[in-house]
Amino acid sequence: FLNLLSAVDVYFIRDDRKTAYLYYKNCAVKVTAKGIDIIDYIDLGGYVWKDQVIDRDFKKCRADKCDYKQFISNISGGAEDRIKSVESTIGFLLHSYKNLGYCPAVILNDEVISENPEGGTGKGLFVNAISHLKHTVTIDGKSFSFERSFPYQLVSADTQLLTFDDVKKHFEFERLFSIVTEGITLEKKNKDAIMIPFERSPKIVITTNYAIKGKGGSFERRKWELEFTQYYNQEQTPLKEFGRLLFGDWDEDEWCRFDNYMVNNLKGYLNTGMVSSTHKNLRKRKFIAE
């Protein structure tokens, strides 16, 4: 009976070097360096993964008074070059296309150097924002071990972002080299291993309170680092500043501003690529770590 069934080729829409797509309940949003277009699904010309569809509608609106835009300015110290760098990084993470020449892991760190770093600078909220647009799997960095059986069992073929959250001191970034540049092998209990090739594998984010050790071209080609200022702490929180929880307490209008801000960051990235900025303490932090 199975021999009588014909195979059907299913074409999934994928980002390419110049084009990115975001999928909402009511439409697909096509983003290029030149503009942002809303496309009806009937005109899309292919399939999308169910888990990659964002559970809200999209419409165009102004984004200049967006909570999250102000949050990005705050964690960037209000410096224009740092804001542009963070916004271009957002665009990079929203663009599912992976360039074989350069597709680094994004490493988020604190600007302030401390013997007992407390975090709370906004790294988690930064990743949380991306997760509201991209199918994200988060791994607890404190308990993660490369030696553990099936370390990536939560990852699937439609995962777009893999985050190692709050990794420990002396995290072995070198152990991720093959994932960053070659793809990821998924192993699950009692199932055959599946190799997700580089171009379809998730982009990588690492959040940490410590310097990621490593020297040489191999390390530099595989990482893109951002420092967040100590604008937020246990006393000064986003909740206290905005009077509502980011994401959790937003109404429809604020979600509209957020979506348009993020889509514009994606458009900006497709224009400029990743924008670098000066790091205040990153080199010093690495020297201490050595």
Predicted segments — roles?
Residues 198-201, 216-289:
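Phosphate-sensing "switch" segment of ASCE/P-loop ATPases
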Residues 164-167:
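Walker B catalytic acidic pair
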Residues 150-157, 188-207:
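AAA+/SF3 P-loop NTPase mechanochemical coupling elements
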Residues 28-158, 224-226, 262, 267, ...:
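P-loop NTPase catalytic core of nucleic-acid-dependent motor ATPases
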Residues 122-123, 170-174, 212-218, 232-237:
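Switch/connector loops and helix/strand junctions flanking conserved nucleotide-binding motifs
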Residues 135, 172-196:
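Conserved catalytic/switch belt of AAA+ P-loop NTPases
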Residues 1-48:
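Intein modules and their embedded homing endonuclease domains
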Residues 2-14, 196-209:
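Short, conserved secondary-structure transition motifs
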